[in-house]
């Protein structure tokens, strides 16, 4: 059978299932696909097909993630589900699977557990704007008061981490019963997807964001000027636009006098394009790898920030020993390494391999960073951790 063509005119949203181990994240993912397949909006997936998630690499870190896609009447979704807790942590911190929203799965039989809290905190730190709650295994908890209690607990937990606990939709259901085709519980999947459709905001498309290109290479074309090459991370750029060169040195302005991609000249480049940008009045020595070209005023160079990081385990190629206060590794942002010093959070004595925690970083030279910027932590050329900037200090 030919792969189903998805309707690209629908709004596209990236979501994922999060929550404590064995609360039913993968079963719910399978139930959503199987239910929507009946409506022609997905390919039915069995639990095992999702659970044997393939390995992928992001920022030098191996992560197991299952990707499924489906559509409702209003939207097209890419949905991620991770088999293990560590995969979630790595996924969220590296941004390997971008999440515009999440479905938090909580078993009514257990209530919120440690990983429930951790996933909510991580979602907050990495900027997931909203989530919908699926109270699972309600077929096993017939006492409505017990379900009410768990729901109240989840709402309070969401509020304590800065989400809108009062207005977050909470759907009570049974992923397993829905997957088995029980109509009563299938209706709950319908209710869940209606909530996801309405409550999780449609993200701003990358092309509508302010222009940014990470500089990979710089060359001179005799008689024409300096050409900067790299991938357009977001936004669009047109001929004769003004850009700023940000990071490492003082910020400078330049005018775009030419653009090309795959040896063809263009009038416009947009998010996702690998392009060469010709800049007027800029010397070869004025630009270097690691800087960015950006829409004027849209991003500033910073040296100090707070971040949420994950330290690789020894088996993942990470360090064998803990990191102490004052540790000075390289921080790899976009296309370059910059040395920086780590200050641990109050009360934290060390970071052990496999931990995820909050740190403060002071770089030796300023880099174009903003809240949500992703980076790798490297030592002697190998990746020992990954992080997300959660707050810029200076």
UniProtKB/Swiss-Prot annotation:
Functionally, this protein is described as follows:
GTP hydrolase that promotes the GTP-dependent binding of aminoacyl-tRNA to the A-site of ribosomes during protein biosynthesis.
Query: Matching CDD domains, A to Z?
Result: EF_Tu, EFTU_II, EFTU_III
Region annotation (G1) ranges: 19-26
Pfam families recorded:
GTP_EFTU, GTP_EFTU_D2, GTP_EFTU_D3
Q: Where is this region: G2?
A: 60-64
**Disulfide partners:** none
What Enzyme Commission number does this protein have?
Answer: 3.6.5.3
How is this protein organized at the quaternary level?
A: Monomer.
Gene behind this protein = tuf
Compartments where found: Cytoplasm
Keywords of this entry: Cytoplasm, Elongation factor, GTP-binding, Hydrolase, Magnesium, Metal-binding, Nucleotide-binding, Protein biosynthesis
Annotated transmembrane regions: none
For the region G3, give the residue spans: 81-84
Q: Give residue ranges for domain tr-type G.
A: 10-204
Q: Which terms does the record give in the GO molecular function aspect? A: GTP binding; GTPase activity; translation elongation factor activity
Kindly provide the name given to this protein in its UniProt entry: Elongation factor Tu
Reaction catalysis annotation: GTP + H2O = GDP + phosphate + H(+)
User: May I have one GO cellular component term?
Assistant: cytosol
Q: Which SUPFAM superfamilies match?
A: EF-Tu/eEF-1alpha/eIF2-gamma C-terminal domain, P-loop containing nucleoside triphosphate hydrolases, Translation proteins
């Amino acid at each position: 059978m030919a792969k189903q063509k998805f309707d690209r005119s629908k709004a596209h949203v990236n979501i994922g299932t999060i929550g404590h181990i064995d609360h039913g994240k993968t079963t719910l993912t399978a139930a959503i696909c199987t239910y929507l397949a009946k409506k022609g909006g997905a390919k039915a997936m069995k639990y095992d097909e999702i659970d044997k998630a393939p390995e992928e690499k992001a920022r030098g870190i191996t992560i197991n993630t299952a990707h499924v896609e489906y559509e409702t009447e209003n939207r097209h979704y890419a949905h991620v589900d991770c088999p293990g807790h560590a995969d979630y942590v790595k996924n969220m911190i590296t941004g390997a699977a971008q999440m515009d929203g999440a479905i938090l799965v909580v078993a009514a039989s257990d209530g919120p557990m440690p990983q429930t809290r951790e996933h909510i905190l991580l979602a907050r730190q990495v900027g997931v704007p909203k989530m919908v709650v699926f109270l699972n295994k309600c077929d096993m908890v017939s006492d409505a008061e017990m379900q009410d209690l768990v729901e109240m607990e989840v709402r309070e937990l969401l509020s304590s981490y800065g989400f809108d606990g009062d207005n977050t939709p909470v759907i009570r259901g049974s992923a397993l019963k829905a997957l088995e085709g029980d109509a009563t519980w299938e209706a709950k999947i319908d209710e869940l997807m209606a909530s996801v459709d309405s409550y999780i905001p449609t993200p701003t498309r990358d092309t509508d964001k302010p222009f940014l290109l990470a500089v990979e290479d710089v060359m001179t074309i005799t008689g024409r000027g300096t050409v900067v090459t790299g991938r357009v991370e977001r936004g669009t750029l047109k001929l004769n636009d003004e850009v700023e060169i940000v990071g490492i040195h003082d910020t400078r302005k330049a005018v775009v006098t030419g653009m090309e991609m795959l040896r063809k000249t263009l009038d416009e480049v947009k998010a996702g394009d690998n392009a060469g940008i010709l800049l007027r009045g800029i010397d070869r020595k004025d630009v270097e790898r690691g800087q960015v070209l950006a829409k004027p005023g849209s991003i500033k160079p910073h040296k100090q920030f707070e971040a949420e990081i994950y330290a690789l385990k020894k088996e993942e190629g990470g360090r064998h020993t803990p990191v102490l206060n004052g540790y000075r590794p390289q921080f790899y942002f976009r296309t370059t390494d910059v040395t920086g010093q780590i200050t641990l959070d109050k009360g934290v004595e060390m970071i052990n391999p496999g931990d995820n925690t909050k740190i403060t970083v002071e770089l030796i030279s300023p880099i174009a960073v903003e809240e949500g910027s992703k980076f790798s932590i490297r030592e002697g050329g190998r990746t020992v951790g990954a992080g997300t900037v959660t707050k810029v200090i200076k």
